[in-house]
């Protein structure tokens, strides 16, 4: 029997590996290389250009933290833009809120969505059966450029790393358009990379520097993601009005009775308490 392993480079001398039971599918699209694997520990997982995007085992952590943090701060959010998110997990979580009226999901590569609908129904379950969701298969940077000013209450940038198709989602122009199309009390959540390895930390600081120049409130929160580089991952929270701690509406969120596996309002508070080494790196962007 072949001993097959998937390995992802996290640094020049560091790799993360998962033993693979089956290589389910492989395709080169006009945008990127897509692969689906099955493993014992992490279930089915998929990669884009050799980087893990999500696994069945730990996807709930990422998808709960990108959605429930802003929703607990402003429970009146109604119109949401998801940039990226082709696996469907972010849409699944945000559509759990009955108060959400409209979700636009902009994914550059339709094949990601269609293949996740085949191999990862755990996350893609809401993509075709909720009338509030509209999928757009185009470049997110171009979508926000022509979107209506002040239209969205929440933007969730559920993107890949700043290489390949995701590179344009880490630019000044993109963040400027996000600020413009958000309502007066709008919130932007941005995939902020990891603070640990040098190359990832560089991209984290680069993104944070651009965002904090455009929003009066710009903070960073953390979560534990076992299959991402170092396991220590960050989101950026930027807002025109709401502070993620001072305006946390814990009682309101808890009254909804949403069952989560990772997020809770106590964790919400702690997620913004960053280690000193992360604070030091963020201060270097000042």
Curated annotation (Swiss-Prot):
The keyword Repeat does not apply. GO terms for molecular function: spermidine synthase activity. CDD domains: AdoMet_MTases (cd02440). Its main location: cytoplasm. Spermidine binds at residues 63, 87, 158-161. Pfam families: Spermine_synt_N, Spermine_synth. Belongs to the spermidine/spermine synthase family. This is Polyamine aminopropyltransferase. It comes from Clostridium acetobutylicum (strain ATCC 824 / DSM 792 / JCM 1419 / IAM 19013 / LMG 5710 / NBRC 13948 / NRRL B-527 / VKM B-1787 / 2291 / W). The lineage of its organism: Bacteria, Bacillati, Bacillota, Clostridia, Eubacteriales. The gene is speE.
């Amino acid at each position: 029997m072949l001993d097959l392993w998937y390995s992802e480079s996290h640094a020049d001398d560091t790799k993360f590996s998962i033993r693979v039971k089956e290589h389910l599918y492989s395709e080169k699209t006009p945008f990127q290389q897509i692969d689906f694997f099955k493993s014992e520990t992490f279930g089915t997982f998929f990669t884009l250009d050799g980087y893990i995007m999500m696994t069945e085992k730990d996807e709930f952590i990422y998808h709960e933290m990108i959605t429930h943090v802003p929703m607990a701060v402003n429970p009146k959010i109604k119109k949401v833009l998801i940039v990226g998110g082709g696996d469907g997990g972010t849409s699944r979580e945000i559509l759990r809120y009955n108060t959400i009226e409209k979700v636009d999901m902009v994914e550059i590569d339709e094949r990601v969505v269609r293949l996740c609908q085949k191999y990862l129904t755990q996350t893609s379950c809401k993509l075709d059966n909720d009338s509030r969701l509209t999928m757009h298969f185009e470049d997110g940077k171009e979508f926000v450029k022509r979107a209506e000013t002040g239209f969205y209450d929440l933007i969730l940038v559920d993107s890949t790393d700043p290489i390949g198709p995701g590179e344009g989602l880490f630019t000044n122009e993109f963040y400027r358009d996000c600020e413009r199309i958000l309502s007066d009390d709008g919130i932007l959540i941005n995939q902020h990379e990891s603070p640990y390895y040098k190359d990832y930390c560089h991209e984290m600081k680069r993104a944070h520097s651009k965002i904090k120049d455009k929003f009066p409130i710009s903070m960073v929160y953390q979560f534990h993601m076992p299959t991402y580089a170092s396991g220590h991952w960050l989101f950026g929270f930027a807002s025109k009005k709401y502070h993620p701690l001072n305006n946390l509406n814990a009682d309101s969120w808890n009254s909804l009775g949403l069952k989560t596996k990772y997020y809770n309002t106590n964790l919400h508070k702690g997620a913004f308490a960053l280690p000193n080494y992360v604070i030091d790196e963020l201060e270097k962007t000042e």
